[in-house]
């Protein structure tokens, strides 16, 4: 359902903390995602009348490292019908409000695990080292779900593709577009 990857301490000097992620701990990195939340940022936010919806990636494992602030993370396994709660800071991880890992660590959950996050009052910054499987598809990777954690039943309430930016150039002069296309 999840695992922790403690960072290896490489150096501690006055004013400097230097840690590393051992490369063998993440066999494949397909994407490196920088995620910045403002104060009390909620991800995903309220949607379709659901106050606290969920994400679930069909084809992506998440390897989350909090760099600044704190993240309140809930994950849910539909197979085990089990939910876990974490508070993740740059230096510690708490599970169910108890200290669980007293050092910098990355939390990992595989594809198929539901998750949702709230950032603390100072906001937060994280890096996610994503591992993408053959089922990865950006058009559904950020679908938003309504999930019943008692029964495990869920449904898509927002197509994640609707929130993806459109990077295409917008031609102001349609005559120019016609010339370019000829």
Features from the language model and the residues they span:
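Histidine-centered metal-chelating micro-motifs
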Residues: 104-117
């Amino acid at each position: 359902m999840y695992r922790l990857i403690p960072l290896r301490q490489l150096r501690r000097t006055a004013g400097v903390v230097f840690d590393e992620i051992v490369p063998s701990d993440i066999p494949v990195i397909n994407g490196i995602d920088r995620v910045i939340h403002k104060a009390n940022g909620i991800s995903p936010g309220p949607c379709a009348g659901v106050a606290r919806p969920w994400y679930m990636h069909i084809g992506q494992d998440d390897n989350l490292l909090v760099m600044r602030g704190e993240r309140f993370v809930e994950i849910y396994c539909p197979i085990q019908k089990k939910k876990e709660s974490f508070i993740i800071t740059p230096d510690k991880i708490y599970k169910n409000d108890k200290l669980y890992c007293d050092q910098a660590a990355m939390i990992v959950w595989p594809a198929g695990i539901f998750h949702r996050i709230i950032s603390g009052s100072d906001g937060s910054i994280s890096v996610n080292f994503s591992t993408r499987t053959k089922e990865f598809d950006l058009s559904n990777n950020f679908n938003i779900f309504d999930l019943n954690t008692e029964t495990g039943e869920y449904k898509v309430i927002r197509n994640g593709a609707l929130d993806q930016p459109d990077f295409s150039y917008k031609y102001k002069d349609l005559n120019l577009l016609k010339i370019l296309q000829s």
